[in-house]
Swiss-Prot record:
This is Glycogen synthase. Synthesizes alpha-1,4-glucan chains using ADP-glucose. Keywords: Glycogen biosynthesis, Glycosyltransferase, Transferase. Its EC number is 2.4.1.21. It comes from Polaromonas naphthalenivorans (strain CJ2). Pfam families: Glyco_trans_1_4, Glyco_transf_5. GO terms for molecular function: alpha-1,4-glucan glucosyltransferase (ADP-glucose donor) activity; alpha-1,4-glucan glucosyltransferase (UDP-glucose donor) activity.
Length: 494
């Protein structure tokens, strides 16, 4: 089976969130399951530099306002997965964030930049740009690639099944409806039952309306987005798709996230030999300027600093941690950036509590590994969370997660209760309402458990024993691909 993945990011070349981690690991797992997999990616500077053995496949010419568009085929340098790169310097040769200009606003031509990504993916699926390789399945990821589903649906030569994965429904790719003509799609699509969304053009709806099957990155999130509370205004569209929507949990790339072999941490360790984790903790405390105190539980945040991630709740719950005496009292390490108000508030907390609170307003992959290994507990208090990878990494590193019961967090963490602890099922701590009081209660529960070494040790080991592999996810995707193909063959359309 030939599968083409269309996406805007791939780890380690371009990463703004978990989408990149998925594209960095899932294709390899699918190849391991027997699929013939290729990616199609925008020719951002880091992607052009990170794809080796490039050969020109097709000179596309001037489309989407770009003076020159060339389709190249090479292999990702880090894992050898084949990847098409859309070389369009006018649209993609820009520094920094793939979506945002240096002033923090969206690039004004993002419609053309990601419309081109979808257009190329669909024309590859139609066998037009590389006649030597035509996919059986076109798998588009998030709004950046969603328009591929609309282009494929309108192309008479398309025989590929289309699958669309929602990594985060909140980011929808909304544009001025007057710019619809720039996409070159039939005008009949720009209606409320098509791509129109409250007077705007929605890339997200291209995937929701025109993909044969829709997936999200956890079973619970698949149910949540069909409700008004989590549907971001699209719950009706999602409910209308019914059984076409399913959830498949993300996995963990064991080659990247493994404390036994991680070259980025102070000392290796495993469930059988945990001594290295204490060394990682002391090293992290020294690096961040926290008091070096083996008995002090270190709570950590590795996240975008946004209200979606519930970090305003953490600020309001912080006194619950800091009211303990400094000696042996809880510490907090925060890494990430985002909302300027949250950045300022966490910076102020660090200034007010030296040795107890440390903040690094940057995303640094190596530092994220050191925090994951050195912290005792990882905080993920999200208001909504499609899957969440942070808690999966934390479990693997014996860093006990404290999470809200929502989305993929609910699917991957077993909250500590009397029953779950006695049954040796507990892997973390969980709270329900999105309130500072509920989070504070979970934090205090974690502090109390940390004071019971035998209990904490059991939580760590149970978490490290969890198996969230990409092999399992790949098996589910392969089954979905086959089922979608069979449905197409049986009906001619879905």
């Amino acid at each position: 089976m030939k599968v083409l993945h269309a996406a805007a990011e791939v780890y380690p070349l371009v990463k703004t969130g978990g989408l990149a981690d998925v594209l960095g690991a899932l294709p390899e797992a699918l190849i391991g399951a027997g699929a013939d997999v290729r990616l199609v990616l925008p020719g951002l500077p880091a992607i052009l530099a990170g794809v080796e053995q490039q050969q020109v496949v097709h000179e596309i010419g001037a489309v989407f306002g770009a003076g020159r568009v060339t389709l190249r085929l090479g292999r990702l340098a880090h894992n050898g997965v084949p990847a098409y790169v859309i070389d369009a310097p006018y649209l993609y040769q820009r520094p920094g964030n793939p979506y945002l200009a240096p002033d923090g606003g969206e690039w004004p031509d993002n419609l053309q930049r990601f419309g081109l990504l979808g257009w190329v993916a669909a024309h590859l699926a139609a066998g037009e740009l590389d006649p030597g390789w035509t996919p059986d399945v076109l798998h588009a990821h998030d709004w950046h690639a969603a328009m591929a589903c609309a282009y494929a649906a309108c192309h008479p030569a398309t025989r590929a099944a289309t699958v669309y994965t929602i990594h985060n429904l909140a980011y929808q790719g909304l544009f001025d409806e007057d710019d619809f003509h720039l996409l070159g799609l039939p005008s009949r699509l720009m209606v409320p039952v098509g791509l129109e969304f409250h007077g705007q053009l929605s890339f997200m709806k291209a995937g929701l309306k025109y993909a044969h099957r829709i997936t999200t990155v956890s079973p619970t999130y698949a149910h949540e987005i069909a409700t008004e509370a989590f549907g971001c205004g699209l719950d009706g569209v999602i409910r209308a798709r019914g059984a076409d929507v399913s959830g498949i949990l993300n996995g963990v790339d064991g080659a990247v996230w493994n404390p036994a072999s991680d070259p980025l941490i102070a000392a290796p360790y495993s469930a059988d030999m945990l001594d290295g984790k204490a060394l990682c903790k002391a090293a992290l405390q020294r690096e961040l300027g926290l008091a070096v105190d083996a008995g002090a539980p270190v709570f950590a945040v590795v996240s975008r600093l946004t209200s979606q991630k519930g970090l305003d709740l953490l600020l309001d719950a912080l006194p619950a941690l800091l009211n303990f005496p400094a000696a042996g009292g809880p510490q907090l390490a925060v890494q990430g950036n985002g909302d300027p108000a949250l950045e300022a508030a966490f910076t102020a907390a660090a200034a007010a509590h030296p040795g107890r609170v440390a903040v690094r307003l940057v995303y640094d992959e190596a530092l994220a590994h050191r925090i994951m290994a050195g912290a005792d507990a990882m905080l993920v208090p999200s208001r909504f969370e499609p899957c969440g990878l942070t808690q999966l990494y934390a479990l693997r590193y014996g860093t006990v997660p404290v999470v809200r019961h929502v989305g993929g967090l609910a699917d991957t963490v077993v909250g500590a209760s009397e029953a779950s602890v006695q049954a040796d099922r507990a892997t973390g701590f969980m709270f329900g309402p999105a309130t500072p009081a509920a989070l504070a209660q979970a934090l205090l529960q974690a502090v109390a458990a940390h004071g019971q070494p035998a209990l904490w040790h059991r939580l760590m080991l149970r978490g490290m024993a969890q198996n969230f592999s990409w092999t399992a996810a790949a098996s589910q995707y392969m089954a979905l691909y086959r089922e979608t193909q069979q449905a197409m063959q049986a009906t001619g359309k879905l």
